[in-house]
Amino acid sequence: MSIIENTEDLGVLRFITAGSVDDGKSTLIGRLLYDSKAVLSDQLSALSRAKNKRTVGDELDLALLTDGLEAEREQGITIDVAYRYFATAKRKFIIADTPGHEQYTRNMVTGASTAHAAIILIDATRVTVENGVADLLPQTKRHSAIVKLLALQHVIVAINKMDLVDYSEARFNEIRDAYVTLAKQLGLTDVRFVPVSALKGDNIVGASERMPWYAGEPLLDVLESLPVETQAHDALRFPVQWVARQDGSSADDFRGYMGRIESGEVKVGDVIAVLPSNRTATVAEIIAPVPGGTASVAHAFAGQTVTIRLAEDVDVSRGDMFVTSGEPVAPAKKLEADLCWFDETPLSPQRKYLLKQTTSTVFAKIGGVKQVLDVHTLSHATDRHELKMNDIGRVALTLQKPIVCDTYDAHPGTGAFVLIDEATHHTVAAGMIREFSA
C-alpha cells in the first residue's frame, strides 16, 4: 500500500513555493518529494543515473525532479505553473511550483490564487548584511507583496543554504529580523521561519543535528500542522456556469444549473435568490460527482462543483449568481481594485478591456491609477498614470453593466477577476476587488 493510500482524510493543503532564481527552490521541492517517499521507483532510478556538475560523489541532484520546468525556461517556452503532488501519513499536499524569474511573476499569481500557504525561499548566501541589518532581494519583497494581495493564510520563510554559511545562527537571525520588518510593513500576520539546507536535507523532513540552536519544527512538520480555513460557513455564492438539459433538446423538461460553489453551502429545500433579477426559488435537487458518476445529495458546500435544480421556473442564464434569499447583495458597476499587471503593453485608459469575474464577462473602462507599489521601498507612488509589466497598483474601473461581486478579503472567489485586452485577447492583469458601488 502506498503512502497516499495510508493517508487519513485530513484535507489537502495547497501551497506555493516562491524564490529568486538560484535560491534552491527546485532542490527544496525535490527534497520534500524524496524524503517523504513520494518519488516513484523509475524516477529514483533515473535520478541515480543522472549526473551533472552540481553533484558530488553519490549525491543525487534532487533539482532534476523539477527540471522539466527548467528545461522549458531554457528553450524560451512560455512557462506555466507546474503542480506537484505528495502525501504523508498526516496530510495530502499540492505544490504550485512557480518560476523564480521576475518576468514570470504572473505565474506566481496564478499559482497563489488557490493556495492556502506560501513558502518564501531566501538564499542565506545572497543576502547582504551591513552593520547587522540584512537587505532582502527585490524579488523576495515582490513575492511577499503578492502573498499579501492574495490574502494567503500562512507564510513560511525557508532560509536556505545554511550549510554554506556554516549553519550560522547569527545569519539566520539577521535575515529573520529583516523579514519581520518586511512582514509588518506589508501586514503579514502569520509568518513562520525555518532554517534549512535543501541540498543536505537539514530541517526539511527531520530536525537537523547541525543547527541545535533552532528549537522549532522542521519544514514538513510545519506544513502538516497548518490549519486550513474554508468558506463553507460563509454566505452562499454560486455563479452559474452552464444551463444543462438532460438530453440537450429544447423540449426536455430537466433544467439544471451547473457551477462551482465559491463560498457557503446549499441544501435541498433552501430558498435562494437569483441575481441580478432578484427572483427567488427553492432548491429541489443537488447533483454532485461521486465515485463512478453523479448522484443526488442533500447538501453541498464551498469548493464543490454541482448541478442545482430549482422547484420554480425562473429565468436563469450563465453569469447569474445564486445567493441566500434575503441577503443584501447589490450588483456593482464601479470598482476599486489592486491589479498585478502581466503584459508588456502598459495599462492605458485609452485601451479597451474585458473584465472576467467568475462566469461573467463585461467591458471595463479604466478610470485612473491611484497608486503603484514600489517593491524596493514598499512605498506607494501616487504620480504614476500607467502600470507596466509586473507592476502592482490600485486602479479605479467602471463597468459597462453591473456584476455581482464581493471584496476579495470577504470572498476571494467572487472578489477576484482578470482583465483581457480586447484587441490582443491577452490576459493582461489579475485583479482583487477592494471596494465597489453601484
Task: Identify what each model region corresponds to.
Residues 3-106, 115-128:
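P-loop NTPase switch module centered on the Walker A-proximal segment
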